[in-house]
């Protein structure tokens, strides 16, 4: 039986909020089988829970938010959600003493490190996967994203940025997903933005935590970060990281192929909601025999250790 996963122990870290620029304490706790992914704001009295759910997602200019029926929100969940998807963690309570998850270095890598430091525990309950049975596609202008049936999880992402720092040969990235591939090839890719946009937002009291420490910053001609890029195609790898986190908002690892052109958080979520709304397009499945499970979801010892 392929089992659900949670953490072995509580793990805690501090970081800076992208919006407020203030210190945020992040605490991640193990959770019982079938709990799902729960984000919790402990700065509110009483604390407010936000279950990861496709219909609760709101896209903003700066990040992805989860919003409840009272219009209370928790922001900047996307990179941590990608780390959970990458490691296949089904059940977890994520607490912050602020209205946002800390931005850390702008990638998912610090969250991967914390989750692996906590250790991954298998629970004695079957893990559910969402298997794509029919092609579903969404479009907005020249942007599009689609899911198709595939016995694994593959991603094919293309961006289209006309910028001297983003070479045309580095605007497409393909990945046959596994936990190991995610950690090594995707998790370290950072978010990016224009210096002029960051300066404008900060003049309006927004994006106060934005800096060279948590993003790739570009001007009209070049990358401004002293250390440059982590990958020559870091921009498109980060967009794929975002998509992995966005698609995991359904609460299950997906068995299917994701292809996108110029997609972002809003379109990724629109695709996920379109899939879920078309009941014939998907099914939940479990695996009693590990040999039947797609290779994509077999946790390598290098990641699970």
Swiss-Prot record:
Q: Where is the active site?
A: 265
EC number(s) recorded for this UniProt protein = 3.5.1.108
Q: Give the UniProt entry's GO cellular component terms.
A: membrane
Q: Would you identify the family this protein belongs to, as annotated?
A: Belongs to the LpxC family.
Give the top-rank taxon of the lineage listed in the UniProt record for this protein: Bacteria
The top EC class, named as a word, is hydrolase
State which gene encodes it: lpxC
Record's function text: Catalyzes the hydrolysis of UDP-3-O-myristoyl-N-acetylglucosamine to form UDP-3-O-myristoylglucosamine and acetate, the committed step in lipid A biosynthesis.
Protein known as = UDP-3-O-acyl-N-acetylglucosamine deacetylase
InterPro entries of this UniProt entry? Ribosomal_Su5_D2-typ_SF (IPR020568), UDP-acyl_GlcNac_deAcase (IPR004463), UDP-acyl_GlcNac_deAcase_C (IPR011334), UDP-acyl_N-AcGlcN_deAcase_N (IPR015870)
- Work out whether the entry's keyword set contains RNA-binding: no
Species per Swiss-Prot/TrEMBL record: Photorhabdus laumondii subsp. laumondii (strain DSM 15139 / CIP 105565 / TT01) (Photorhabdus luminescens subsp. laumondii)
Q: Which reaction does it catalyse?
A: a UDP-3-O-[(3R)-3-hydroxyacyl]-N-acetyl-alpha-D-glucosamine + H2O = a UDP-3-O-[(3R)-3-hydroxyacyl]-alpha-D-glucosamine + acetate
């Amino acid at each position: 039986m392929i089992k659900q996963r949670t953490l072995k122990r509580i793990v805690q870290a501090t970081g800076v909020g992208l919006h407020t620029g203030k210190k945020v304490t992040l605490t991640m706790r193990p959770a019982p089988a079938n709990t799902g992914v729960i984000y919790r704001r402990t700065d509110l009295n009483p604390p407010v829970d936000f279950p990861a759910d496709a219909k609760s997602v709101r896209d903003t200019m700066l990040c992805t938010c989860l919003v409840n029926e009272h219009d209370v929100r928790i922001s900047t969940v996307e990179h941590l959600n990608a780390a959970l998807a990458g490691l296949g963690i089904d059940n977890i309570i994520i607490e912050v003493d602020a209205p946002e998850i800390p931005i850390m270095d702008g990638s998912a890598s610090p969250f991967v490190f914390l989750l692996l430091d906590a250790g991954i525990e298998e629970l004695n309950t079957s893990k559910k996967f969402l298997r794509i049975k029919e092609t579903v596609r969404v479009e907005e202008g020249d942007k599009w994203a689609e899911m198709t049936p595939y016995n694994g999880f593959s991603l094919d992402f293309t961006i289209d940025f006309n910028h001297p720092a983003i070479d045309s040969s580095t605007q497409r990235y393909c990945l046959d997903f596994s936990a190991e591939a995610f950690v090594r090839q995707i998790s370290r890719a950072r978010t990016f933005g224009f210096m002029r946009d960051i300066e404008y937002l900060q003049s309006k009291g927004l994006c106060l935590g934005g800096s060279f420490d948590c993003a790739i910053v570009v001007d009209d001609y070049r990358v401004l970060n002293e250390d440059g890029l982590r990958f020559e195609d870091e921009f498109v790898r980060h967009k794929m990281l975002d998509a992995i986190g966005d698609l995991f908002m359904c609460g299950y690892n997906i068995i299917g192929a994701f292809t996108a052109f110029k997609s972002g958080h809003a379109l990724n979520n629109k695709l996920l909601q379109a899939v879920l709304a078309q009941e014939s397009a998907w099914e939940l499945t479990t695996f009693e025999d590990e040999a039947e499970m797609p290779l994509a979801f077999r946790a390598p010892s290098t990641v699970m250790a």
